[in-house]
Design a protein with these regions (language model features):
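N-terminal Rossmann-like dinucleotide-binding module
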Residues: 1-37, 286
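Residues at the starts of beta-strands that form the adenosine-phosphate
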Residues: 2, 24-26, 81, 106, ...
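Beta-loop-alpha module in the N-terminal Rossmann-like domain of NAD(P)-dependent dehydrogenases
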Residues: 14, 36-99, 118
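C-terminal helix-rich "cap/oligomerization" subdomain common to oxidoreductases
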Residues: 19, 28, 40, 56-63, ...
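Local beta-strand N-terminus motif with an aromatic residue
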Residues: 24, 55-59, 129
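A contiguous active-site-proximal alpha/beta segment in oxidoreductase catalytic domains
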Residues: 52, 66, 89-146
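Predominantly a Rossmann-like dinucleotide-binding segment in NAD(P)-dependent oxidoreductases
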Residues: 116-184, 189-198
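Contiguous beta-strand/loop segments that form the cofactor/metal-binding neighborhood of enzyme cores
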Residues: 162, 166-256, 263-270
Length: 293
């Protein structure tokens, strides 16, 4: 089996995951300093078409948000499954269009947290308590302020597109009634200006750039409260807080094993149409929650 990874930021993680699954990996990135197998997607796909019979088992779209639709569309004819990094594409309609135009390809919005090894335990706790808080709060970690990350026309949004999809996917794992749930609160708010931000390990500030996206996002859905924040002034808080009885689980960064579980599970279910209908419903639901914030 062989896969293609487009974009070698988070894409390097997928390269490692795929190699762990004994899958050959073709990497593509425009930046030659990242040492990709190819710097041109079209050439890489042509090379595969000429040298290998059969389609790639998976493709992984790990490029900037505004390129997701185009890259996914380009690689779909060559791949059995296409994984698109969060936040997916601009709208739910765009996602549905990708699916409809490529009936022989399966699409997955990356929801790696749903494949954590302990997700069963977390779901059990969530169902037993009166309220649950899901928090992904960073202490001053705005990604590359002034870059495409913080330009709404390119990123489609800020923390609502960066971190909130993770929390929404966890919520769906916990609440069996997510399909019919209606948020009682859904807000995205920008509290800072570019000149107020500082360079961190998440990137340097481009003082000539744009910062017109949300940096705080909140949802309330049934007994669940979700908070995503790029710039808290006190501390990091990436956890799930269960009430009555009190129990707190520290999320931290998602383990690589969860990504491996996700990819492997999708491959194993390649012919399971119920599985893919469930994925489509989940992916459309996440898109619909964040597209109008």
């Amino acid at each position: 089996m062989k896969s293609i990874v487009v974009g070698l930021g988070i894409g390097n993680l997928y390269k490692s995951v795929l190699e762990n699954l004994n899958i050959d990996v073709l990497t593509v990135d425009k930046d030659s300093d990242k040492k990709p197998d190819s710097t041109n997607l079209g050439s890489a796909l042509l090379q595969h078409e000429l040298s290998v019979s059969g389609r790639l088992i998976t493709g992984h779209v790990c490029t900037p948000n505004f390129t997701h639709y185009g890259v996914a569309h380009d690689i779909a004819p060559y791949c059995k499954i296409v994984f698109v990094e969060k936040p997916g594409v601009r709208t739910a309609n765009d996602w549905q269009r990708l699916v409809d135009q490529n009936p022989d390809t399966k699409f997955v919005l990356v929801k790696n947290n749903m494949w954590r090894d302990n997700i069963g335990e977390l779901c059990k706790h969530a169902k037993q308590v009166e309220s649950v808080e899901l928090n992904w709060i960073n202490k001053d970690r705005v990604p590359s302020p002034g870059s495409w990350f913080t330009t709404k026309e390119l990123a489609f949004g800020g923390v609502s597109r960066d971190l909130m999809p993770h929390l929404l996917s966890l919520y769906m794992a916990f609440d069996d009634n997510w399909r019919t749930a209606e948020p009682t609160q859904a807000l995205a708010h920008r509290r800072y200006d570019l000149q107020e931000l500082s360079s961190t390990d998440y990137g340097e500030v481009n003082t000539n750039g744009v910062y017109n996206v949300d940096d705080l996002c909140k949802f309330s859905i049934n007994k669940y409260k979700l908070t995503a924040d790029w710039r808290d002034t006190q501390s990091d808080k990436r956890n799930i807080i269960f009430s009555n009885p009190d129990y707190k689980f520290e999320l931290g960064l998602c383990p690589e094993q969860a990504y491996e579980n996700m990819v492997n599970d999708c491959i194993q279910n390649i012919d399971n149409e119920d599985f893919w209908q469930d994925q489509l419903e989940k992916d459309l639901w996440i898109h619909k929650q964040i597209e109008n914030l």
